[in-house]
Amino acid sequence: LGDASLGMGRDYYQKEDVKNTEALAEYQKYVASMLKELGYKNADAAAKGVVDYEKSIAKHLLTNEQSRDNTLQYNPKTIAELSALVKNINLPEYLKKVGVNTDKVIIGELGYYKNFDQLVNANNLPVIKDYLKFHMINGGASYLSQKLGDTKFAFYGKFLNGQQEQRALDKRAFEVIDGT
């Protein structure tokens, strides 16, 4: 089982320095701009909630160094063991409803699941909805419209990675087909 996605690498949320503080501020603006495209009237406040939520998730994820250690990412658990960690969801019932029939799962981020009930509960449901909406539009931005694709490139391509210009549409199309 995987964990929740972050919009940037874990260290941006956890290492407090000038570079990461600037990146988080730009990321929050980016999240707000994407939520505005979804019609949010309170996009700035929702974006702050999304970024704060991702910070709370990042606290429980492996560091880059730890994630290279396969023994830390290989955590076999029975459904009963996982259910003891994750109490806010009736896991056996959920797995049955989605058609998964298994007695064991392998968890890559055990810290996330140990803190799942703190991260996913009725009290933070509104921010979780904003988080999910943002990640849906962010994931498909390059395919939804030129404006969304350009906005995504401006943040991830230019700001985070220093690319001067976006690759040509035909090259990007081949990358999608090739899965690269």
Residue ranges and their predicted role:
Residues L1-T180:
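Noncatalytic, helix-rich "gating/capping" subdomain that lines the substrate-entry/channel surface
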